[in-house]
Every structure is written in C-alpha cells, then in structure tokens.
Amino acid sequence: MLYTNNYNIPKIIIALDFYNKKEAMTLVDLLDPSVFYLKIGKEMFTILGFKFVKELHKLGFNVFLDLKFHDIPNTVFNATKAAADLGIWMLSVHASGGKNMLLSAKKALKSFKKPPLLIAVTMLTSLKEKDLKEIGIKISLKDYILILSKLSNDCGLDGIVCPGNQAKKIKSLYGDKYKIITPGIRLSSDSSFDQKHIITPKEAKEFQIDYIVIGRSITTSKNPIKKLNLIIESMR
C-alpha cells in the first residue's frame, strides 16, 4: 500500500457494506489493521452480531460501531454501555435524540478506562433541505447541523458525523479535539449512489476532516486496493 498513518491526510474508515461475512472478509484480508479502520453498520451487525466485532478485533482492527442509537435516554444508556463492553474504538448516536439522550450516552462510558469515541450523527447524508421541511424543520440544513454540533459538543461528545463542507466551520468553533467524520467520499469518476452530500478525497483534506468513511466506492470495486491507492494519492 502507498499509505501510512504518517501522511498528513484524513484517516480512512472502510465501511463494510456487505450482506454476508465471506464478501466482507475477502476485503478485510486485503487491509492493514495498523492503517485502516473498519465500520460496522446496522446491516452487518444485524446479520453477524457482536461475534463479528470480536473477530475483527482479533485481527487487530479498530472498529467503528455505527448503530446510530436514537431512543429514550435509559435505553441509549444501556445500549451504549453494551456496545462499549465489546471494546470498540468508536460508537455513533443520533444528535437529534436530544440533550438528555446524549448525556445518558456519555454517562454510560464513565466507568470505562478506555471508552470508545462517542460520535453524534448530525444528519443522514441522504437528506436534503426539502427532506427537513417535510418533517417540520424549517431552518436551513447548514444551521440545523451547526445547532446539533453545538449540542453534541456541549454534552461532551468527541465529535460528529457531518457533510464535508461544514467541517471547517465546525473545527473553527470547537477546535481540533472535536473530531469530524465524513461519509459520502467519492472520486469524481464514482457513482454517487444515494448520497446527496458528496466531496472528493482531496476536498476532505482541504476541509480539515479527521476521518473519511468510504464504503461502496471500495466494496463494489473489482480492484479495491487499486481504488484505495487512487483515493490516497488524490489526497497527497
């Protein structure tokens, strides 16, 4: 691979967007756990459960468990604690769950010596402003993200998932310790799939994003390592 973590570029999280373990492991076996992070979302976690997380840990990978908890505070407290018990590196909750829910998630991690990074999802990248209006949110998408970013920071979370074009503004408000994770990363030649907020890897570097999440651009590629090298080279 061309890439090492010594490069001053966003770190790469590979989203394991598969429907079966065999396909997932075919890709995982090509990756260096000292360089790449892995994301398990609702699909793979529902299919394979916590045992798959532990298997990836045994291979040396840091795992981002992207389950986007969004429920009453007590439920999120217990779910967060259960997730942290797996020894994961990062965990997501929905910022729109509100202050009490976010505080409950943070509280659930207090007993852990090395808790996972707790990250708030501000908005799904499949949504546009008209989608917000349809559910009664009348402010702009940009302002909505800024409000939820502030709420998440105030509640002591470690960072947010947000569209890349908001990253610089959020970094200027909350500093480098507040991590920015951005999905929807595509080379200009890639399909957008169902993502509405797309940026290129080069833009991700310019926007000071900490972690980029790359899924179907890699998982649907006939040569995922070649594609990863192209992405990495475009950020150097």
UniProtKB/Swiss-Prot annotation:
Fetch the Gene3D superfamilies from UniProt: Aldolase class I (3.20.20.70)
List the PROSITE patterns: OMPDECASE
- Keyword presence, Lyase: yes
Q: Which residues form the active site?
A: K68
**What catalytic reaction does the record list?**
orotidine 5'-phosphate + H(+) = UMP + CO2
Annotated family: Belongs to the OMP decarboxylase family. Type 1 subfamily.
Supply the alphabetized keyword list: Decarboxylase, Lyase, Pyrimidine biosynthesis
A biological-process GO annotation: 'de novo' pyrimidine nucleobase biosynthetic process
Protein known as: Orotidine 5'-phosphate decarboxylase
Q: What is its EC number?
A: 4.1.1.23
Task: Tell me the function of this protein.
Answer: Catalyzes the decarboxylation of orotidine 5'-monophosphate (OMP) to uridine 5'-monophosphate (UMP).
Q: What class of enzyme is it?
A: lyase
